[in-house]
Amino acid sequence: MIQEELESIKEGMSKREGAEVIAQLGGGRFIAMTGAKDFFIGPKGIVFKIGRNSKTVNYVRINLNSMDTYDVEFLSVRKFKEKVKSTVKGVYADSLRGAFEQNTGLRTSL
């Protein structure tokens, strides 16, 4: 049981990969513009909370898949209930900002 958990954690995203995802989104400017906080790197990729927006998305999960592209989930978490608002699969690194802006309504830079 513990061995299976360790293997699933190893399959997840590393801190370095998580930092690279944030850098591809815009780094410090992205964090300031979107109110991103509470970053967590786990077996399903990087998850972080974002500020208020018109599409009621308050969490974003980004995972690197086997084709070296990203799968992005936009979530609404309320009272311990997780609802996936939208999912974008196969996003290239240079398209992460556009996918984020389109699905949250938040700008990532000035």
Question: Can you describe what each PLM-predicted range is?
Answer:
Residues 68-79:
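Short, surface-exposed beta-strand/strand-loop-strand elements in extracellular ectodomains
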Residues 2-54:
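Negatively charged, low-complexity tracts enriched in Asp/Glu with abundant Ser/Thr
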Residues 63-67:
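Short beta-strand micro-motifs enriched in acidic
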Residues 2-12, 78-110:
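Mixed-charge, Lys/Arg-enriched low-complexity segments
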Residues 55-60:
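Short, surface-exposed coil-to-beta transition loops
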